[in-house]
């Protein structure tokens, strides 16, 4: 295999998984037992996960604020586009909730979570399920939206408060951009540039950190296999297939029907026109990197340029249905694995956290895995549970990430198609 092929992220992840499995099996073998502790490797892998978690909220803050300042949306088209995004993400959340509550893939994992909790130094699952926390206090939740100081949302990992603060900053800077005072205008331009610069800096740091993902995956896979054996992949197959099923329903059933109902296009014609962009998104694992191909396909589908740019370029922060569906299903899967009886309001809180987090992580490689610790923390999972959960999903996230990207690309194209049809219809 050539050096260029080995340097490809997919190849590196596959090699990391193979090496992780090998080390895990070696630690379980008679000649390897006691030679090293796979749990130590797992802790090394979690260092990167914690670092990604620390980067996620500042990135979300700058991404949301910068998007509000920089995105040029006409009022009517902007409201229409946001309505399309809201419907799409609600459908994605509904699909996730329906599949998880119907098929219950997490029930067979209850014993495995217990073992992994012991491996990370925690006593039992029961110690991490606090009955008093399972009851939602809406007044307390509302008060959490208003921090005591500006840095508190990022310090405490509060997604909703972070996004609200970012939105207020972005709206304020945007509203001041029309000032006629030259000195004020320079100050506003400086603030806008600072928001863009902050987003670019944290994005670059995150891209550097993502390059270490194969090392973290190797460590986490060796930890999981060393403790649970190869049976972990057999048991994970249910979770993998159900997430792929959810993404398939969203991408291949709902989107074509929505294109027919809202965009006046035949379902097969929509999928045929979008196929090149979707496969490109799957291959490169990024809806943002696929933008040129997506715009080309939309042009060939006779979607007007303004609608295409609003949905594909301006709406990057809002078209993340694949990520939202993945986050909701993963959090509920882990809840089932822990034996937690989550009622509908609690599940909706998880869905809301996923939607908010996904809005600020657009274009970031492995975005789903990056924001997963934040979503789990905001959904009431303890640090120990998060440390035990990440090794479960990381071995198969590389394939799910590509499926998520493909769905996100198709969601971008659906938004442009419907928006273009509405513009032509008046």
Feature annotation, model-predicted:
Residues 39-50, 144, 152, 190-207, ...:
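Short amphipathic alpha-helical coupling elements at transmembrane boundaries
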Residues 81-92, 237-254, 273-278, 348-361, ...:
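Small-residue-enriched core segments of transmembrane alpha-helices in multipass membrane transport
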Residues 328-426:
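Transmembrane alpha-helical segments and their short flanking loops
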């Amino acid at each position: 295999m050539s050096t260029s092929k080995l340097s490809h992220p997919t190849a590196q992840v596959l090699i990391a998984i193979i090496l992780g499995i090998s080390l895990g099996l070696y630690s379980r073998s008679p000649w390897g037992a006691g030679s090293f502790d796979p749990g130590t490797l797992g802790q090394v892998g979690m260092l990167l996960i914690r670092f990604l978690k620390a980067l996620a909220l500042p990135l979300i803050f700058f991404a949301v604020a910068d998007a509000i300042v920089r995105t040029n949306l006409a009022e009517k088209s902007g409201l229409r586009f946001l309505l399309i995004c809201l419907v799409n993400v609600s459908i994605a959340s509904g699909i996730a909730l329906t599949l998880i509550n119907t098929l219950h893939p997490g029930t067979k994992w209850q014993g495995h979570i217990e073992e992994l909790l012991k491996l990370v130094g925690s006593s039992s699952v029961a110690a991490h399920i606090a009955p008093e926390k399972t009851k939602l206090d809406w007044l307390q939740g509302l008060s959490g939206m208003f921090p005591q100081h500006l840095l508190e949302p990022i310090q405490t990992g509060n997604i909703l408060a972070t996004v609200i603060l970012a939105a207020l900053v972005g709206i304020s800077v945007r509203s001041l951009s029309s000032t006629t005072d030259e000195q004020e205008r320079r100050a506003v331009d400086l603030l806008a540039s600072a928001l863009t610069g902050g987003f670019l800096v944290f994005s670059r740091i995150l891209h550097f950190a993502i390059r270490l993902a194969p090392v973290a995956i190797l460590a986490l896979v060796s930890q999981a296999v060393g403790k649970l054996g190869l049976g972990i992949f057999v048991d994970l197959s249910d979770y993998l297939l159900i997430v792929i099923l959810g993404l398939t329903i969203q991408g291949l059933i709902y989107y074509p029907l929505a294109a027919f109902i809202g965009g006046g296009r035949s379902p097969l014609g929509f999928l045929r026109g979008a196929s090149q962009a979707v496969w490109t998104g799957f291959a490169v694992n990024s809806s943002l990197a696929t933008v040129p191909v997506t715009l080309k396909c939309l042009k060939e589908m006779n979607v007007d340029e303004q609608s295409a740019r609003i949905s594909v370029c301006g709406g990057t922060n809002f078209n993340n249905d694949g990520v939202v569906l993945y986050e909701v299903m993963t959090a509920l899967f882990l809840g089932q694995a822990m034996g937690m009886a989550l009622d509908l309001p609690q599940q909706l809180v998880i869905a809301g956290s996923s939607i908010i987090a996904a809005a600020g992580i657009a274009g970031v490689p492995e975005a789903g895995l990056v924001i997963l610790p934040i979503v789990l923390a905001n959904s009431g999972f303890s640090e120990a549970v998060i440390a035990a959960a990440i090794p479960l999903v990381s071995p198969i996230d590389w394939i799910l990430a590509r499926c998520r990207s493909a769905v996100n690309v198709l969601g971008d194209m659906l938004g442009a198609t419907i928006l273009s049809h509405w513009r032509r219809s008046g």
